[in-house]
């Protein structure tokens, strides 16, 4: 049997991390078994579904590189198919027309709740033989079995049973002729030959209804696996107050897709004590029986740690392709300065996100208007004039511009003046970067370049002279 899974989001908002994890688990399960992964857009909620949300979902899937083998399918383009199946069910007696008004149903609901009963349809039209005009408004309901129970072996939670007496006759077509969500899902899974449905635990109560409809259609019933919810680190349901929840917001905040995928796969699944997984390892090791039944807690610090790991572990040339987007957001012109891959090597240890890296690299490419006030006050003092002049001349004399030769020039300045490296290094750092912190000074000066470094040292010397004149 060919394994076939699906990810079926509703386009009423962005792709959130819970949906992304569900997509990842479905994708991994299919890939682990050499099967196929289907993308289906469940856009039956015409009022809330938007083109922007569809685009956001596709962007998120593409950014995570969760490629699909079929689709994307859109439910709104399959209404003829759904209605054909409903008409067939009406002929076979597994569905019936219901003419009950909203007022009657609301009164029934209030009466049942007043008695402490669970609100449900009372099957009035199921047993009615009244004649109705063809154009009289009605819904179509599924004639749910009234005896027995529905049992399915959830691949994460084990056997789950529902009594059919707990399930009322579900509306499968509205008065406007549009099919409902639970029915469309069933026909889609049947037509698309889905073998395994991996989805959130909020769908557990839909499962017995969908199984009963599948059985009424004499269609194969897929295997179900319901993944637990994701909570914030305070144990409450993950929401915006815990930080970003949109996949693309993590992109915007400077995370690599590899880091987010690695974090999401471990958010409810484990393989021994291993924490770091390549995509190939995820595919190789992923199984549903290793997915936890318990809710997972989202820990941003752990994700940040993983992101820092991947910034330094992945090839710099690859990381640079993602960094480029953030550089563009900062409006930095990188034509005159180090290659982005070299920048990744330079700043990787210091920066935990690509956004942070982009925001801290401007001085490599563009001259700064002024020095950091605190750093200048501390290090650009008259005592720094001689070290800056000497190191400037030694840097100017370098014919082979390498980080090693830059280091020798700084060391030679300290030796010549008989001062510690800090007496040369700190004024030089402020002079060439405008701030008091940077990566190792030799590689920083090398990356900034000979001409630009000397120009900035001269600017710092002028700054010192100007301050002296003001005193």
UniProtKB/Swiss-Prot annotation:
Its main location: cytoplasm. One of its GO terms (cellular component) is cytosol. Binds 1 zinc ion per subunit. Zn(2+) binds at residues 98, 100, 125, 127. Its EC number is 6.1.1.17. Disulfide bonds: none annotated. Its cofactor is Zn(2+). Keywords: Aminoacyl-tRNA synthetase, ATP-binding, Cytoplasm, Ligase, Metal-binding, Nucleotide-binding, Protein biosynthesis, Zinc. ATP binds at residue 240. Pfam families: Anticodon_2 (PF19269), tRNA-synt_1c (PF00749). It comes from the Bacteria. Transmembrane segments: none annotated. A motif ('KMSKS' region) lies at residues 237-241. It is found in: Cytoplasm. InterPro entries: aa-tRNA-synth_I_cd-bd, aa-tRNA-synth_I_codon-bd_sub2, aa-tRNA-synth_I_CS, aa_tRNA-synth_I_cd-bd_sf, Glu-tRNA-ligase_bac/mito, Glu/Gln-tRNA-synth, Glu/Gln-tRNA-synth_Ib_cat-dom, GluQ/Sye. A motif ('HIGH' region) lies at residues 9-19. One of its GO terms (molecular function) is tRNA binding. SUPFAM superfamilies: An anticodon-binding domain of class I aminoacyl-tRNA synthetases (SSF48163), Nucleotidylyl transferase (SSF52374). It catalyses: tRNA(Glu) + L-glutamate + ATP = L-glutamyl-tRNA(Glu) + AMP + diphosphate. GO terms for biological process: glutamyl-tRNA aminoacylation. Catalyzes the attachment of glutamate to tRNA(Glu) in a two-step reaction: glutamate is first activated by ATP to form Glu-AMP and then transferred to the acceptor end of tRNA(Glu). Monomer. Belongs to the class-I aminoacyl-tRNA synthetase family. Glutamate--tRNA ligase type 1 subfamily. This is Glutamate--tRNA ligase. It comes from Shigella dysenteriae serotype 1 (strain Sd197).
